């Protein structure tokens, strides 16, 4: 905890979140292949931590050094490094444990020294045909600025070519852009065992085939390494350059940014390590981490199953939403009543189908959507292009600064513009993180607007693994305000008022304060008062102070926080009425929801915004009331199920101990599975009421 005992540093809280991910890899009740994939998720998270959080603290240190500041950031950086090293040590222990567990199931992840003669012959052939064409050594000399050529977050093999007392060094990029990281080695017929080798080890086995005939050496050794660069970039914000041009330049900056982490194989010779640090300009503020033979463990997210179903999670087929059934089109269904989709339990196909129908429906005159992250081959985006071809007015607000998706969004922007879509890049200096879709139809009574307000991205792939809400409504008051958000994006200086939607940066802080203050006043008046909050991150000090005030006034507060949480629960007289859990399971918890008791007339809101200063004050975010009583109760039920979790819920406390919620005599409840069953029953009940046939699970 910081000197201010009321707040946990967000960077340390983030590492505590990633420790919860590592707990899933350690959990023996999780299927084996899924445990290995959690190692990949942990590693991918840690890569992003160094690119973003670590880099930010390092920059603060350098600024303080230039301006004569204090050592607070240095102290924080030291704590971050210490915690990250401990997590890496635990990671290595778990990796070795999982390798042994796989071997007990006749699955072997082998290195180059464990191959039999037949396997060696197969490996040599595979290398010559598939791998060697993608290998070009980068020889390290004093004249070459290797920092210009080394790719961020790529795994390399650093090669030592020794001849007597002299040594030359070279770098080999492991070509995972062209080849799979995991290679199945054929076995003799009738053998039960499955053998997998990493591409890294195939290259190690064939090092001589790369260098022989070009260099003289007595000994050849390879060592794993990886470098992480600072992910930030500066935009010039100059009038003569478009945002698209500025972003392209910014991404070029990222390609050559200075390193913030260097991970190397711990057996690497000292002279070689010193030379690489010199060539890569590694400073003492950067993180130098000794590791094992393999880096870029994020690739383990895609670790292959070898044909044994029990080693993976049982599939949960996405549910078809019965509210759409029995209507000629999606618009008739939405006009009849508001519809709530909860991914990945519900199929995202409902959204792609809605946009597909809008693309050719003769009544549709316009489509507006804002895009933060989308799939590479997005059907939804292609439907928007089809809509333009069919004469619809299509406006797409593309967020070019969606971190690590910038290149994909630039490419989509070009494709959409070429097709005739009106592409807008939003408000300078302010990310657009809202999840809005607005479709306008010309109907008998005039123009009718249909709106989507969501907590997650329009991304077909992540909708299968992220939990999120989509609210579809023909409520003309809400739809008019969604139209107002698009107007605000196009002209942020034009005065506009929102009576129903809560929109960052216009009124989010004041409206959230108003909602929390009302619960405080009700508690002080002796009335029942409660707040239920679910977000990814809670770090905004102003909102945390309000929550402390609410707790002190007697408001009962329950929260589900997946990631960073700077609020300290359980402080005497300050946060005793605050209970916080975090759920890490097969799906990534992503919705933002607020429920306030409101003197017995609960108000429910869904939002795109986390409770962070950037989201409340410096981004365009949308929080919407849920007005349909049926849907309000459904969201409250889902949150209630999560608070009964006795399998995957951890308590958030001031020590960041990540203890699982005590089960006691209660039965096991795994909330994600329980929510799936709950929604399945909801759909079954809806079909029964409508007299419709239950679909076959295989078709859901």
Curated annotation (Swiss-Prot):
<feature type="binding site">
    <location>
        <position position="45"/>
    </location>
    <ligand>
        <name>ATP</name>
    </ligand>
</feature>
<dbReference type="InterPro" id="IPR036832">
    <property type="entry name" value="PPK_N_dom_sf"/>
</dbReference>
<protein>
    <recommendedName>
        <fullName>Polyphosphate kinase</fullName>
        <ecNumber>2.7.4.1</ecNumber>
    </recommendedName>
</protein>
<dbReference type="InterPro" id="IPR024953">
    <property type="entry name" value="PP_kinase_middle"/>
</dbReference>
<keyword id="KW-0597">Phosphoprotein</keyword>
<dbReference type="InterPro" id="IPR003414">
    <property type="entry name" value="PP_kinase"/>
</dbReference>
<dbReference type="GO" id="GO:0005524">
    <property type="term" value="F:ATP binding"/>
</dbReference>
<dbReference type="InterPro" id="IPR001736">
    <property type="entry name" value="PLipase_D/transphosphatidylase"/>
</dbReference>
<dbReference type="GO" id="GO:0008976">
    <property type="term" value="F:polyphosphate kinase activity"/>
</dbReference>
<dbReference type="InterPro" id="IPR036830">
    <property type="entry name" value="PP_kinase_middle_dom_sf"/>
</dbReference>
<feature type="domain" description="PLD phosphodiesterase 2">
    <location>
        <begin position="585"/>
        <end position="615"/>
    </location>
</feature>
<dbReference type="Pfam" id="PF17941">
    <property type="entry name" value="PP_kinase_C_1"/>
</dbReference>
<feature type="active site" description="Phosphohistidine intermediate">
    <location>
        <position position="433"/>
    </location>
</feature>
<comment type="similarity">
    <text>Belongs to the polyphosphate kinase 1 (PPK1) family.</text>
</comment>
<feature type="binding site">
    <location>
        <position position="403"/>
    </location>
    <ligand>
        <name>Mg(2+)</name>
    </ligand>
</feature>
<dbReference type="InterPro" id="IPR025198">
    <property type="entry name" value="PPK_N_dom"/>
</dbReference>
<dbReference type="InterPro" id="IPR041108">
    <property type="entry name" value="PP_kinase_C_1"/>
</dbReference>
<dbReference type="Pfam" id="PF13090">
    <property type="entry name" value="PP_kinase_C"/>
</dbReference>
<feature type="domain" description="PLD phosphodiesterase 1">
    <location>
        <begin position="428"/>
        <end position="462"/>
    </location>
</feature>
<dbReference type="GO" id="GO:0046872">
    <property type="term" value="F:metal ion binding"/>
</dbReference>
<feature type="binding site">
    <location>
        <position position="590"/>
    </location>
    <ligand>
        <name>ATP</name>
    </ligand>
</feature>
<feature type="binding site">
    <location>
        <position position="562"/>
    </location>
    <ligand>
        <name>ATP</name>
    </ligand>
</feature>
<keyword id="KW-0067">ATP-binding</keyword>
<dbReference type="Pfam" id="PF02503">
    <property type="entry name" value="PP_kinase"/>
</dbReference>
<keyword id="KW-0479">Metal-binding</keyword>
<dbReference type="GO" id="GO:0006799">
    <property type="term" value="P:polyphosphate biosynthetic process"/>
</dbReference>
<keyword id="KW-0677">Repeat</keyword>
<dbReference type="InterPro" id="IPR025200">
    <property type="entry name" value="PPK_C_dom2"/>
</dbReference>
<keyword id="KW-0418">Kinase</keyword>
<keyword id="KW-0460">Magnesium</keyword>
<keyword id="KW-0547">Nucleotide-binding</keyword>
<dbReference type="GO" id="GO:0009358">
    <property type="term" value="C:polyphosphate kinase complex"/>
</dbReference>
<feature type="binding site">
    <location>
        <position position="373"/>
    </location>
    <ligand>
        <name>Mg(2+)</name>
    </ligand>
</feature>
<comment type="function">
    <text>Catalyzes the reversible transfer of the terminal phosphate of ATP to form a long-chain polyphosphate (polyP).</text>
</comment>
<feature type="binding site">
    <location>
        <position position="466"/>
    </location>
    <ligand>
        <name>ATP</name>
    </ligand>
</feature>
<keyword id="KW-0808">Transferase</keyword>
<dbReference type="Pfam" id="PF13089">
    <property type="entry name" value="PP_kinase_N"/>
</dbReference>
């Amino acid at each position: 905890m910081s000197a201010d005992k009321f707040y946990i540093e967000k960077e340390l809280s983030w590492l505590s979140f990633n420790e919860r991910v590592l707990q899933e890899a350690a959990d023996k009740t999780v299927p084996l292949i899924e445990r290995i994939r959690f190692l990949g998720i942990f590693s991918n998270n840690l890569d992003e931590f160094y690119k973003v959080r670590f880099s930010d603290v390092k920059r603060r240190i350098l600024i303080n050094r230039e301006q004569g500041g204090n050592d607070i950031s240095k102290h924080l950086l030291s704590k971050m490094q210490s915690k990250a090293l401990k997590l890496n040590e635990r990671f290595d222990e778990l990796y070795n444990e999982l390798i042994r567990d796989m071997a007990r199931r006749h699955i072997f992840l082998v290195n180059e020294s464990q191959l039999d003669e037949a396997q060696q012959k197969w490996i040599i052939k595979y290398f010559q045909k598939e791998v060697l064409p993608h290998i070009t050594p980068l020889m390290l000399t004093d004249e070459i600025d290797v920092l210009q050529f080394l790719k961020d977050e790529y795994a390399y093999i650093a090669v030592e070519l020794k001849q007597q007392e002299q040594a030359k060094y070279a770098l080999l990029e492991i070509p995972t852009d062209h080849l799979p990281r995991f290679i199945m080695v054929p076995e003799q017929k009738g053998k039960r065992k499955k053998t997998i080798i990493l591409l890294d080890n195939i290259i190690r086995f064939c090092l001589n085939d790369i260098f022989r005939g070009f260099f003289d050496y007595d000994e050849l050794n390879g060592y794993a390494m990886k470098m992480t660069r600072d992910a930030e970039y500066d935009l010039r914000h100059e009038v003569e350059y478009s945002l698209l041009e500025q972003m392209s330049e910014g991404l070029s900056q990222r390609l050559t940014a200075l390193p913030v982490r260097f991970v190397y194989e711990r057996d690497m010779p000292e002279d070689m390590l010193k030379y690489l640090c010199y060539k890569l300009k590694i400073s003492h503020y950067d993180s130098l981490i000794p590791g094992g033979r393999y880096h870029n463990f994020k690739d383990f997210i895609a670790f292959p199953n070898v044909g044994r179903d029990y080693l993976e999670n049982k599939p949960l087929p996405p549910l078809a939403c019965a509210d759409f059934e029995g209507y000629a089109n999606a618009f008739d269904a939405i006009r009849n009543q508001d519809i709530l989709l909860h991914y990945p339990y519900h199929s995202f196909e409902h959204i792609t189908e809605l946009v597909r129908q809008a693309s050719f429906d003769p009544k549709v005159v316009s489509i507006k959507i804002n895009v933060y992250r989308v799939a590479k081959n997005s059907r939804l985006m292609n439907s928007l292009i089809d809509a333009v071809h069919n004469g619809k007015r299509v406006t797409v607000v593309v967020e070019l600064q969606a971190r690590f998706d910038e290149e994909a969004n630039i490419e989509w922007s070009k494709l959409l513009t070429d097709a005739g879509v009106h592409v807008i890049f939003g408000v300078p200096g302010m990310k657009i993180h809202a999840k809005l879709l607005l479709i306008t139809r010309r109907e008998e009574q005039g123009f009718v607007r249909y709106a989507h307000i969501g907590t997650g991205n329009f991304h077909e792939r992540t909708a299968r693994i992220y939990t999120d809400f989509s609210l579809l409504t023909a409520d003309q008051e809400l739809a008019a305000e969604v139209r107002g958000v698009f107007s605000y994006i196009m002209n942020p200086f034009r005065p506009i008022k929102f009576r129903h939607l809560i929109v960052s940066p216009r009124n989010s802080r004041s409206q959230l304060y108003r909602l929390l203050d009302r619960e405080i006043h009700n508690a002080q008046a002796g009335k029942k008062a409660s707040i239920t909050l679910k977000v990814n991150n809670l770090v905004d000090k102003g909102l945390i102070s309000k929550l402390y005030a609410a707790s002190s006034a007697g408001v009962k507060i329950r929260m589900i926080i997946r990631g960073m949480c700077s609020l300290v629960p359980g402080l005497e007289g300050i946060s005793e009425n605050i209970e916080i859990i975090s759920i890490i399971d097969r799906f990534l918890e992503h919705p933002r929801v607020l429920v306030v008791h409101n003197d017995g007339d609960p108000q429910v809101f869904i939002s795109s915004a986390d409770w962070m200063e950037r989201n409340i004050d410096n981004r365009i975010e949308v929080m919407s009331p849920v007005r349909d009583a049926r849907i309000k109760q459904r969201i409250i039920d889902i949150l209630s199920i999560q608070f009964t979790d006795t399998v995957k819920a951890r308590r958030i406390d001031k020590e960041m101990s990540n203890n699982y919620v005590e089960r006691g005599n209660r039965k096991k409840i795994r909330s994600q599975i329980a929510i799936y069953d709950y929604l399945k029953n909801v759909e079954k009940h809806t079909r029964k009421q409508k007299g419709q046939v239950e679909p076959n699970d295989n078709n859901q």
